[in-house]
Structure formats: structure tokens, C-alpha cells
Amino acid sequence: MQINISNLDVKNHLDKFIEDRLEYEFCKQDKYLYLENDNLKLHYNNKELFIDFNDSEILNRINPKTKKCSVVQAIEGRSKAKLTILDTTAGLGRDTFTLAARGHTLLTLEKDSYLYLLLKDALQRAQQINYLKEIANRITLINTDSNEYILTTDKSFDCVYVDPMFPPRKKSAKVKQGMQILHQVGFNDEVSNSNLLDNIIQTQISSKAVVKRPINAEFLSNKKPSSQLKGKTNRFDIYSL
């Protein structure tokens, strides 16, 4: 696998935390990683993506005084136990970090190598912050395809979370820049997403799966959930397996 990096300084920075198997090709292009003030960023189609778990939005989500967000309600249900959760689609890592802040242990998968490196860098920075270190340490991040992982692992989990990263709404101007890039870079096709739910059920990797969907979307893989948690623009389909 090759990842194009814009300069040697970035390569030296990445070498601290990525596997030796990755090779780099240095060239100018529309999609590349670069280092700015010791922060790893992605340049893509004249847009910029930077992941920071110490920003105000994340800090508000994980504040104990803040009402539990929908993904937490859907995954925890009425349980007060600390869960082991497989997050099959890391994306920007916000849901993963929010769940880890609740005391849960996360194994988080991201198949896109660019997003993986951004997340890895963000987690390492969070590990250097006293009030975020414990949260970040509950997250294990792996650069792999979710379907492949589920079909080959011998691990089991209390819950599997699937966020297919559906395309942005028609009013794309209202979608934040980071989400615009995420939809373009990390979007999975519907067949892959349907296979993911099928594989979760087939392998019996967990007794519960939670799938995030647009509010009016069809059920993933045409499988009716056991229950649902609905919001204004999206919903969480909950499967008891």
C-alpha cells in the first residue's frame, strides 16, 4: 500500500506511529497529509481535515453534565455495565471517543489509511492531555476493512456499532467541511454495508448490533431491527442477535 506524503518532515512524523509495512511516495497531488504546528492534517480537493479530540464540540459531548447523545442511548440501552464495543466505521472518531468517555472499551476499525493516520495522531495527542488520557487509552485503532476483520477474528463483543457514513444531505452547504471530506474519503457502498450487517449476524460476533441510518432510509440489508431510536435527521436501528 502506498500513501502519498507532501514532504519529508511529515514522513518523519508518521514513522513514529505507523507500521513499517507502509511505503511512501512523495509528490504533489490533490490528496496528501502534511504537518502544521505538530498537527497532522489532510488536504483534499482544496479542503482541509484535522481531527482533535480536545475541541469544544467533543468536550461538550463527553461532559458528564451533558445529556447522553443518541449513540450512547442506543448502545447502552438500560445497561449500566462497561461494555466492549466494536466500532466498524471510525470516521472522525467522535462516536468512538464519546463511548470511551462513558467507560467502555473500544476496538475501532478504519479502512482508509489517510483517516486512520489522522485518528492515530489525534489519539496520541489526546494521550498527552491529563483529562483525556484515560479515555484515549480505552481505544484500540486498527487500519483494516471491517468485513474482513469480522470474518477472520476470534474475538467477541458486547455490541457492534455500524455507521455507514451515508452521503450528505442535498443542502450540502450546511454540512461541515470535515464531514464533507469524510463522506468523500470514507464513504462505503451500500453493498459493503449490507454485507457488514450480514457478517455480524452470521459470525455471531456479538449479541447486539446498532446501525446508524438516515431517518427515512430503508433498513440495512432489508433486515428489520428489534427496536429503534429516532432523531430529527437520523435514527439508530438496534438488533438483538
From Swiss-Prot:
Catalytic activity, EC: 2.1.1.242
Source taxon at top rank: Bacteria
Major localization class: cytoplasm
Catalyzed chemical reaction(s): guanosine(1516) in 16S rRNA + S-adenosyl-L-methionine = N(2)-methylguanosine(1516) in 16S rRNA + S-adenosyl-L-homocysteine + H(+)
Cited InterPro entries: 16SrRNA_methylTrfase_J, SAM-dependent_MTases_sf
Top-level EC class: transferase
Pfam families per UniProt: SAM_MT (PF04445)
A cellular-component GO term for this protein: cytoplasm
Subcellular location: Cytoplasm
Annotated S-adenosyl-L-methionine binding sites: 94-95, 163
Keywords attached to this entry: Cytoplasm, Methyltransferase, rRNA processing, S-adenosyl-L-methionine, Transferase
CDD domains linked: AdoMet_MTases
GO molecular function: rRNA (guanine-N2-)-methyltransferase activity
Function: Specifically methylates the guanosine in position 1516 of 16S rRNA.
Family: Belongs to the methyltransferase superfamily. RsmJ family.
Protein name: Ribosomal RNA small subunit methyltransferase J
